[in-house]
Amino acid sequence: MSEISNIINEPIGDRMKRFEAKYDFKIEPQNYFCVRLDGNKFSNFTRKFEKPYDVRFSQAMVMTTIDTINKFGARTGFTQSDEITLIFDKAIPDDFKKHITYNHLFNGRVSKLLSIVSSYVSVRFNHHFRLLTSNLTNIYSQETLELINGGTAIFDARILEFDENNKYEMLNHLIWRSVKDCYRNAVQTYAHHIFGPAKIKYLNREQMIQLIEENTNIVWSNIPLWQKYGVIIKKQLIKTDNVKNSVITSSFKVFSLKLSYNDTMLKFLFDKYFELDKISEYQLEDYPLSII
């Protein structure tokens, strides 16, 4: 009876906050983190889109990633297929001042980050994709357009946190999503589209590529990098000189490359702005699709 009395005497707000606190994890300000977002049940959503790649779907994903970097201050964005990865630097800078308190976005609260970022991505993707496909009845069926216009596409999200000693795993994570997963999907997507599932069921990637090149006019090395390795997005500064002075504005660099592990690329991921000379050893390919 005394325990019940204590509960009753505790303000209801405090009591509810105790229950909420059970899952109120925080990312430490000295740590790095990334948010990876995936389309929820997108295999059904994209079933009747253009094959092997729907360029408007890709554009919508890129534009959504740009919006999300702009909104939440991620250092680097990556997108392939129906997923987006956002890379965030540590909150405490190297030249920190002792009298200043540093925190991540939303004070590093994981529940806030997951819910707000996934909500924002869902809203922006539906907005962009609806605009890009508006009235394209020659490409999409009425049923598909109604599905797109319904704006019901949603994304889930997960967070990966890395301390200073594991910072390198951020690049490994991106290599996994790009060089491994995206590349595998590209090979399978083309092979499945051209030959169907039965003919490629027991083939490995090299055999699928050989089959494609021997039976079509496709040269695998000519396939766009954005299809094979996904798209990387970073802010960049643009200097414009006029008669009176120089003006510096910011825009976004949207490009693709084949990632590999080295310290140069790891540092590049956390740089605030894109600078070509910092990754000059890589072969870059600008994203070829017009971004409206």
Curated annotation (Swiss-Prot):
GO MF annotation terms: magnesium ion binding; tRNA guanylyltransferase activity
Cited InterPro entries: tRNAHis_GuaTrfase_cat, tRNAHis_GuaTrfase_Thg1, tRNAHis_GuaTrfase_Thg1_sf
A Pfam family of this chain: Thg1
GO biological process: tRNA modification
Listed PANTHER family: TRNA(HIS) GUANYLYLTRANSFERASE-RELATED, TRNAHIS GUANYLYLTRANSFERASE CATALYTIC DOMAIN-CONTAINING PROTEIN
Descriptive protein name: Uncharacterized protein R259
Lineage: Viruses, Varidnaviria, Bamfordvirae, Nucleocytoviricota, Megaviricetes
